[in-house]
Amino acid sequence: MMRVARAIAPLYPQLNVDLLIAGILFHDSGKLWENHYAESGFVMDYDERGELIGHISIGLELVNSLWRKISADKSDAWKNLTPPSEDVRLHLLHLIGAHHGEQQFGSPVDPKTPEAMALHYIDNLDARLEMFAAGYLTAKPLANRIFERVWPLPGKLVKSLEIFRASASESKPNDQLL
């Protein structure tokens, strides 16, 4: 996700890439407490805290807790940053709170900044493309390159064409056309 953010940042100068990267790092941090990971393997059992509070709320709580610890530091060096630390905290909280994109999908707020919108779409794109990759490995094949539906993707999966490559006798495509 960070590579996607860094790749699109030059195309959208209104994005604060540092804030976006911080949002990428923290947006799902609450899942560490939402999900219960058994010692015997990577199985996510249900957890009461996660069910009652959810990873977004837990992530917001985590960032606030870390910020309080930083605020207690006697050093004033971090207090004079630009933009002001409190503004950064507020915007980071917004990124975490809005990363599901809409309230109907669990976000307490809709994305209201370019970074929040970018994080939502980067996260969504990452999740969906991972679903395709996993589906090609686990879904039942129905025909050549066609697989049964993997929820929540729409319809059956169709495997992509192979990556285009010029044959040895052909010249490379003209990059200037792109």
List where the protein language model places each region:
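Divalent metal-dependent catalytic cores for phosphoryl transfer on phosphate-bearing substrates
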Residues: 7-141
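Acidic, carboxylate-rich catalytic segments that either coordinate divalent cations
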Residues: 112-178
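A Trp-anchored, charged/polar loop motif used as the substrate-binding/catalytic surface
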Residues: 4
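Short, surface-exposed polybasic-aromatic patches that bind anionic ligands, especially phosphate groups
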Residues: 1
